């Protein structure tokens, strides 16, 4: 996509309709200004993986990728753009968005697909061969399964720049409801009381099956212990 830019000095103040920008690589550094509306339209279409042919008035034309966009947090509008100059036919490392397709087996079972890494670093064989996105098919994934960076099929000529063991997508178990969470906490408490000898296995089973509350069986256990202590004292006398 083509962008026309105006030359500027690094500290030059700009009109509100313009955005300050810089393009660079290891050898060059060029400061310029872009029409705000034109850049907004172009960036929505291209994002960070799209190639821009930037022509500076009275100067050169060069291909570049968006490296970073500095935003005005209050106005939610870009105030500065960094471009990275690239060369046609030369490999370029880029961050490509990851998206999923399909409905996983884990989702059918109530699980949740979690995209852990939203952008993956790859090396494309040239600026014109950068994929717009990496699509991961999650159809066969079950709860507990995960897909690593090394599992993802890349377009021809592209190679992975990230750790191949990096988890990119996983399927999480269903989230517990408030009642399920309360039941898990209670089960842990009951197990602890049984292990400490403060609750019988019969009483624990009654609580877990809903036949009695934990407070009720604890009260009964206290009464039983009190009765046992009284009998022991009588025998001692």
Swiss-Prot record:
<dbReference type="Pfam" id="PF14693">
    <property type="entry name" value="Ribosomal_TL5_C"/>
</dbReference>
<dbReference type="InterPro" id="IPR037121">
    <property type="entry name" value="Ribosomal_bL25_C"/>
</dbReference>
<dbReference type="InterPro" id="IPR029751">
    <property type="entry name" value="Ribosomal_L25_dom"/>
</dbReference>
<dbReference type="GO" id="GO:0006412">
    <property type="term" value="P:translation"/>
</dbReference>
<keyword id="KW-0689">Ribosomal protein</keyword>
<dbReference type="InterPro" id="IPR020056">
    <property type="entry name" value="Rbsml_bL25/Gln-tRNA_synth_N"/>
</dbReference>
<keyword id="KW-0687">Ribonucleoprotein</keyword>
<protein>
    <recommendedName>
        <fullName>Large ribosomal subunit protein bL25</fullName>
    </recommendedName>
</protein>
<keyword id="KW-0699">rRNA-binding</keyword>
<dbReference type="InterPro" id="IPR001021">
    <property type="entry name" value="Ribosomal_bL25_long"/>
</dbReference>
<dbReference type="GO" id="GO:0022625">
    <property type="term" value="C:cytosolic large ribosomal subunit"/>
</dbReference>
<dbReference type="InterPro" id="IPR020057">
    <property type="entry name" value="Ribosomal_bL25_b-dom"/>
</dbReference>
<dbReference type="Pfam" id="PF01386">
    <property type="entry name" value="Ribosomal_L25p"/>
</dbReference>
<comment type="subunit">
    <text>Part of the 50S ribosomal subunit. Contacts proteins L11 and L16, the A site tRNA, and the 5S and 23S rRNAs.</text>
</comment>
<comment type="similarity">
    <text>Belongs to the bacterial ribosomal protein bL25 family. CTC subfamily.</text>
</comment>
<comment type="function">
    <text>This is one of 3 proteins that mediate the attachment of the 5S rRNA onto the large ribosomal subunit. This protein has three domains. The N-terminal one is bound on the solvent face, the middle domain fills the space between the 5S rRNA and the L11 arm contacting the 23S rRNA while the C-terminal domain is on the edge of the intersubunit interface and contacts the A site. The protein conformation changes upon binding of a tRNA mimic to the A site, although the mimic does not interact directly with CTC itself, consistent with CTCs presumed role in moderating A site binding.</text>
</comment>
<feature type="region of interest" description="Disordered">
    <location>
        <begin position="205"/>
        <end position="237"/>
    </location>
</feature>
<keyword id="KW-0694">RNA-binding</keyword>
<dbReference type="GO" id="GO:0008097">
    <property type="term" value="F:5S rRNA binding"/>
</dbReference>
<dbReference type="GO" id="GO:0000049">
    <property type="term" value="F:tRNA binding"/>
</dbReference>
<dbReference type="InterPro" id="IPR011035">
    <property type="entry name" value="Ribosomal_bL25/Gln-tRNA_synth"/>
</dbReference>
<feature type="region of interest" description="C-terminal domain">
    <location>
        <begin position="190"/>
        <end position="237"/>
    </location>
</feature>
<keyword id="KW-0820">tRNA-binding</keyword>
<feature type="region of interest" description="N-terminal domain">
    <location>
        <begin position="1"/>
        <end position="104"/>
    </location>
</feature>
<feature type="region of interest" description="Middle domain">
    <location>
        <begin position="105"/>
        <end position="189"/>
    </location>
</feature>
<dbReference type="InterPro" id="IPR020930">
    <property type="entry name" value="Ribosomal_uL5_bac-type"/>
</dbReference>
<dbReference type="GO" id="GO:0003735">
    <property type="term" value="F:structural constituent of ribosome"/>
</dbReference>
């Amino acid at each position: 996509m083509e962008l026309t830019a105006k030359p500027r000095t690094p500290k030059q103040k700009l009109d509100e309709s313009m955005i300050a920008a810089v393009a660079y690589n290891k050898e060059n550094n060029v400061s310029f200004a872009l029409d705000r509306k034109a850049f907004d339209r172009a960036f929505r279409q291209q994002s960070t993986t799209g190639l821009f042919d930037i022509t500076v008035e009275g100067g050169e034309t060069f291909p570049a990728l968006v490296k970073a966009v500095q935003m005005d947090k209050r106005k939610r509008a870009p105030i500065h753009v960094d471009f990275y100059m690239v060369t046609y036919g030369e490999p370029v490392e880029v961050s490509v968005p990851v998206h999923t397709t399909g409905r996983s087996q884990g989702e059918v079972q109530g699980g949740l697909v979690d995209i852990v890494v939203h952008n993956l670093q790859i090396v494309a064989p040239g600026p014109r061969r950068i994929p717009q996105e990496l699509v991961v098919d999650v159809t066969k994934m079950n709860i507990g399964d995960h897909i690593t960076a090394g599992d993802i099929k890349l377009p021809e000529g592209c190679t992975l720049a990230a750790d191949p063991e990096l988890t990119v997508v996983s399927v999480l178990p269903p989230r517990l409801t408030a009642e399920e969470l309360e039941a898990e906490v209670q089960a842990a408490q009951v197990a602890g009381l049984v292990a400490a000898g403060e609750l019988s296995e019969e009483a624990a089973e009654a609580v877990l099956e809903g036949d009695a509350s934990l407070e009720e069986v604890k009260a009964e256990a206290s009464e039983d212990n009190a009765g046992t202590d009284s009998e022991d004292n009588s025998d001692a006398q």
